[in-house]
Each structure stands twice: as C-alpha cells, then as structure tokens.
C-alpha cells in the first residue's frame, strides 16, 4: 500500500504538471528532461506490454522533437474549439459544459473535506492535470480519501478523455502522455481494488 501511495504521489504530480502547465513553464523543465532520457521508461514502475512500451517511447521521442507548445495550445488552450477538452464535466454533463453537475459534486467533496487549492485563472477544478495532482496530494496527506476520489470523481471520466486524446494526430507527445497515463491509472485502480461505476458520456 505504501509503495502504491508513493507511486501516486510521484506520478500524479509529474503527469498532472505536464497536462496542466504550458511546455515553456519553468516547472516542467526537469520533467521534460526526464522524458528526454533514452531509458526513462525503466524508471516508470508500471508494467507495459512490448507493443505499448515501444509505441509510447517512440511517440515521446518523436514528440519532443516537435513544437509541443503549439500542440499544447491546440489541445488545451485554443482559440479554436478544443478537440479534447481537459475538463471532466464536458463529458459527463448532458449539455457538455464546464461547471456541470459532476464538477459541483467534486466541489462538494473538496468542501466537505476542507481541501482548497488555487487554479491559474479560476478555472474548473476537474481539469485532468489538476485531478492528477489532487490524487498525488491525497496520497501524501489524506490517503483515506483517495479511493473515494478516484472512484467517484476521477476514474469515471479519465479513461474516456485519455482514449480520445491518444487518437489526436500530429500531437505525438500528448498521445504518448495519454497512453502512459491510462496504463498508470489502470495500475492504481488494480492496486487500490477500485470498481469504477459505469456512467454515460455525452461527448
């Protein structure tokens, strides 16, 4: 259990930061350096089949030779319509809006347990990057809340979003990041014995 919590702490912060911050943000310097190591995957304590391992490493290597700032802008900022919006309520709300009912439920959870954090521009808290970093925070400080958070507020939609992101062409680095995150979340789910409820997606 302790090893799982440690993994969630490390990988949650690392993956969350890469999804949340722009590539030129100083907070990503060391993380991108990590991914530039030829054998970085040997340090990732998650089991991968050979095909997935090769695909992720090839996409990471190729992606880091591209302009990932442009890719980040296209995927997560705009100004055009985002192909895969990074907020959970977009997929769970019948009207496909941010600040939907699933976000309100997440906010109730945060308020009930007196968890507060500041976002960059008062954006919804159910951003994929923030949710990963919140998982890391809970693993470090409130592990008794972690399973409930993952089961009811995060894993319900995370796989759906990540699978869509993994299919976006010309975004090699973020395609790889999506595949890596899927495998990592699946391992957390197994380790913590989480049964994720089936939900309906509207996008």
Swiss-Prot record:
InterPro entries: DmsD-type, DmsD_chaperone, DMSO/NO3_reduct_chaperone, TorD-like_sf, TorD/DmsD_chaperones. GO terms for molecular function: signal sequence binding. SUPFAM superfamilies: TorD-like. One of its GO terms (biological process) is chaperone-mediated protein folding. GO terms for cellular component: cytoplasm. It comes from the Bacteria. Keywords: Chaperone. Belongs to the TorD/DmsD family. DmsD subfamily. Required for biogenesis/assembly of DMSO reductase, but not for the interaction of the DmsA signal peptide with the Tat system. May be part of a chaperone cascade complex that facilitates a folding-maturation pathway for the substrate protein. HAMAP family: DmsD_chaperone (MF_00940). This is Probable Tat proofreading chaperone DmsD. It comes from Haemophilus influenzae (strain ATCC 51907 / DSM 11121 / KW20 / Rd).
